[in-house]
Amino acid sequence: VKLIIRNTILFFLLFLGIFIAGTQGDKVYAMIADFLEQDSGVLTVVSVDAQRGYPIKNSKFQIIDAEKNEVIEVIETSIDGVATTSLLPLSRNYYVQQTNVLEPYQLNTDQHELMLSSENNRITIENNVPGFIKDYKRTEEKDIEVTSVQLPVESILQTPELPNGCEVTALAAVLDYYGYETNKLELADKYMPKIAFTRSNNKLVGADPHQAYAGNPRSEQQGFFSYAEPIVHTAERYFAVNNDESHTVKNINGSSEQDIYQLLSEGIPVIMWTTVDMKEPRVNYSWYIKGTTEKINVPTNSHTVVLTGFKDDNVFAMDPLKGHVTYQAEHLFNIFEQAGGHAMIVY
């Protein structure tokens, strides 16, 4: 009898459970969910432009358990600049660490600590653009387009010591921009490869300007020029002798206008070969390359400047003969192309 009563009760409870689940399932589920989630919450991270309040997409953040110092989740902001974690235990401390941000914003390296105290928690992380970016706009795709740059490159003149040393003076200005304690004369005398002019069988013999500086940059009459490669080598030798690996030198011959603007937007000044009078190259001089029978024709109005920024239709530069100057962009890049598209960077 007891067995029959027990089985009847069990059957009734089972039937009642099935009935409640079928008729009140949503409420039961909600009650269970509330019970399970009552000690959990989410963290919403908002990534914004510190100056203009633009939401920043594609910002990545690590959520770190402060007690264990373990990364428990990585989140990325959507196009509206918002990212939300999964459920996290309440009453715990967490660190929020930004690991990636859309260019040209600077990474926010602060580690933000907070305690998760409610079901919905929110923190705003701000990012700045570098100070050399003077203006920018937001595109329809929510990217940032830099419209004005001015790099703080100091004016260094080649004269009077280096009447024909615009190339190495331009390099000196770039190294000064990065904080190196060198100067145009040290670079010219100690590091720049040079080949003096000589005469053989009544023929003028000199350097391949892709391999070494032709002549002596200290001389008004015996100095001429080089292209980018010897100046790249000058910087590489300087870094090697001084055991410096913090910067790299790169030949960027053939770069487009867009390529160069992008470099400037990243804070990288560009050493560019143009002409001294901003007119088309006058290729009206020649000599034989030392050690060969090859004769080369070279421009007599070659000049080298440092591009430092841009705005609207203008490009800013440091001219080793004049100091800071402004060029009309279309004209400058036309001359640059005619002069062979020679350029280099240190970054």
Predicted regions and their residues:
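Solvent-exposed loop/turn and edge beta-strand elements of beta-rich ligand-binding domains
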Residues: K2-R138
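Active-site-adjacent structural segments surrounding the nucleophilic cysteine of cysteine proteases
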Residues: G22, V28-I32, N58, E70, ...
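Extracellular/periplasmic catalytic domains that process cell-envelope and extracellular macromolecules
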Residues: P55, P89, E140-D143, Q262-P269, ...
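A mature extracytoplasmic/lumenal domain signature
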Residues: E67, P89, N100-L102, N253, ...
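Surface-exposed patches in mature extracellular/periplasmic domains of secreted proteins
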Residues: Y178-A188, N243-G254
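Loop/turn elements at helix/coil->beta-strand transitions in domains of secreted/extracellular proteins
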Residues: N242-H247, S265-I271, K311-N314, G341-H342
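Surface-exposed ligand/attachment interfaces on beta-rich extracellular proteins
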Residues: S256-I260
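Noncatalytic regulatory segments and standalone regulatory/sensor domains
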Residues: S286-P299, V305-Y347
